[in-house]
């Protein structure tokens, strides 16, 4: 536990899968860059110019890659567009894209747009229960018409973790490129993108990496694709040594750096710079082990005290991500009532609560208190429904 490394919000914070709390090192890094701007003006670009590249070794450690295979840039959706513009090349029968019906909507928007643009279709792997996916169903949909498969490492609603290695290997054996959205896993567990043969991946840094709202996302391209020119070139992806020659000919940077497009936000990148320092002396294996301990405790407490609540997150460790999804009546109302009691969780329509005990800062005692309060709120909600008394309602505003 590194709780003292963070400026923790009041109460019990169980929403790190939406937005992690602010590390003190992130504040310090942003303030340092602000001072540079104030004191040096444009001359500070001498230091800022390759800031993203200097963060690549730390990013590489998070996802199991070499530094040249990763870069901090853009957002998840913008990076997905850049990857699709590069690697989605319909050819004869092999012209369709594959995703799942449980993917985060923004991914599906991007995938469908490229399929429509290039004359393909977006095929969706169905869920048997509306919460989880079967590996066998994913493999069965890796058919000869699929050019590229795009999948989440961890499902954003239920918290199910998919088998990246097995699915990637199966796709590769069938000549299908595989890409992954790792938004709900990076920072919560180790990854092996290079060794697993993942073709490309994206993720955010504002959840488990705690780099702040709108933090630069991450992008991975396996070095087996070295030499592939980005489909959405921009001047920040130009070879750094000759970028300011201002040539009209695009000469891509080495590796994933070529997929940068425009000038980055230095202040947002600075927050990421500070947030990554928190992980310098942390074992990702230890973070994962602690996460599983905490989610085990939470699931056991729910089983014991909340019999009317269904746990929709897999109980098997190998299939579980970092958050626990609870299905219950009046979930939206309950999530708001929790916040009134200084317990921050979140809601997903129509009836899911997501609670995230994060290894770096949450404790068993917090989980015990949260479930005790949940018990009180569920009892009160049942009484309210019995008397047809309305309660507060509001849409969620976080991912």
Where are these regions (language model features)?
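Pyridoxal 5′-phosphate
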Residues: 1-399
């Amino acid at each position: 536990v590194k709780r003292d490394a963070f400026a923790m919000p009041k109460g019990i914070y169980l929403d790190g899968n939406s937005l992690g709390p602010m590390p003190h090192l992130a504040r310090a890094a942003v303030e340092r860059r602000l001072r540079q701007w104030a004191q040096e003006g444009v001359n500070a670009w001498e230091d800022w110019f390759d800031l993203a590249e200097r963060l690549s070794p730390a990013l590489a450690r998070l996802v199991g890659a070499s530094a040249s295979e990763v870069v901090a840039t853009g957002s998840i959706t913008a990076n997905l567009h850049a990857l699709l513009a590069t690697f989605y090349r319909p050819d004869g029968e092999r012209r369709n894209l594959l995703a799942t019906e449980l993917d985060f909507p923004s991914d599906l928007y991007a995938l469908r747009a490229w399929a429509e643009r290039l004359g393909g279709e977006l095929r969706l792997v169905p869920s048997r229960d509306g919460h989880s996916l079967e590996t066998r169903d994913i493999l069965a949909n890796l058919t000869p018409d699929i050019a590229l498969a795009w999948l989440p490492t961890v499902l954003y609603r239920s918290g199910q973790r998919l088998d990246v290695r097995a699915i990637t290997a199966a796709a590769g054996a069938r000549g299908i490129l595989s890409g992954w959205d790792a938004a709900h896993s990076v920072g919560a567990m180790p990854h092996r993108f290079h060794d697993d043969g993942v073709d490309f991946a994206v993720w955010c840094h504002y959840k488990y990496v705690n780099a702040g709202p709108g933090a630069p996302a991450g992008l991975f391209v396996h070095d087996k694709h070295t030499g592939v020119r980005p489909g959405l070139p921009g001047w920040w992806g130009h070879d750094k040594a000759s970028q300011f020659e201002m040539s009209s000919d695009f000469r891509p940077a080495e590796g994933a750096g070529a997929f940068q497009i425009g000038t980055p936000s230095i202040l947002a990148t600075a927050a990421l710079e500070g947030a990554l320092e928190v992980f310098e002396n942390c074992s990702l294996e230890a973070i994962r082990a602690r996460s599983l301990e905490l989610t085990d405790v939470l699931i056991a407490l729910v089983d014991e005290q909340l019999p009317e609540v269904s746990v929709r997150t897999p109980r098997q460790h190998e299939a579980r991500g970092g958050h626990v999804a609870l299905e219950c009546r009046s979930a939206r109302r309950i999530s708001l009532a929790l916040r009134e009691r200084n317990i921050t969780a979140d809601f997903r329509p129509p009836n899911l609560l997501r609670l995230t005990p994060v290894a770096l800062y949450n404790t068993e005692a917090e989980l015990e208190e949260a479930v005790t309060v949940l018990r009180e709120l569920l009892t009160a909600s049942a009484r309210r429904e019995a008397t047809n008394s309305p309660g507060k309602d509001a849409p969620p505003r976080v991912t």
